[in-house]
Amino acid sequence: MTRLWIADVHANLAAFEAVLADAGSADEIIYLGDIVGFGPRPVECTDLLMSLGARAVPGNHDASMLAIRRRSERHPHPRDWDEWTFSQLSRAHLDFLESLPAAVEADFCGVPATVTHHPAGAPYLHPDMPDSVFSEFLGKAARPTLVCGHSHRLIDRSVNGRRYVCIPSIGQPRNGDPRAGYAIERDGEIEFRYVAYDVERTARETAALGLEERFLERWLTFLRTGHDAEWSREYVPGKSVNKWLDGGMARMRPESGSPPAQV
């Protein structure tokens, strides 16, 4: 039995394609959320995920698209990256994201696991956090293993007989390594992998969107290095390890316009 575990593509098609090529065939694919958001190719990445027949859960950026949908906001000239992403997605894409369950059950290395984007009520997690942070939510989990995405770094912690695993990000690493991360499970053994991809292709695609120059310059450095002073913070007790990336940060240039929405 071969099971592919993938997470946090963030509309980075070059990285997604590289991971699928590196992994080869799998009996089952499990996707842990955020297929869209802060990336240049949301349509193609969502199409590719839909074609894989994966068991999938939504991420917070996927949920942002559905929140915009509920507000019936489709701006002819999107003001930020979230609005631009929404303007690209078709009804079929949004229906697909809407259909995803918040959590699914699966086996991870032969042990029953709950699969979701991020543990409910947990802070943004970092591999250097103490056991007490993990035991707080693991003790409430319905199954002995919890497998998630969202933190964009590999985390594999066992506390009091329970295990938390965060699958590393494909499209937006934050660990100082720009390669796309994923995991592959074969006959109950897990292997975490990192694969190089054409970062400059994604950089060119991102630069063409019309983002404000100051944000774009910082974002491309982040993409090329897998590190940013705020978005990749190290763990310091008592301090947040993440500054949230919200759409308001990633503004579009007023003159940039927008390709027509897909129907």
Task: Locate each region found by the language model.
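Beta-strand-turn-beta hairpins that frame and shape the catalytic cleft
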Residues: 1-4, 105-114, 159-163
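Core catalytic region of metal-dependent phosphoesterases/phosphodiesterases
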Residues: 2-98
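Histidine-centered catalytic micro-motifs
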Residues: 8-9, 115-121, 146-154
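Conserved hydrophobic/aromatic beta-strand scaffold that supports enzyme active sites
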Residues: 103-105, 115, 156, 180-184
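Anionic-ligand binding region
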Residues: 130-165, 170, 180-182
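Acidic, His/Gly-rich catalytic cores of divalent-metal-dependent hydrolytic chemistry
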Residues: 158-263
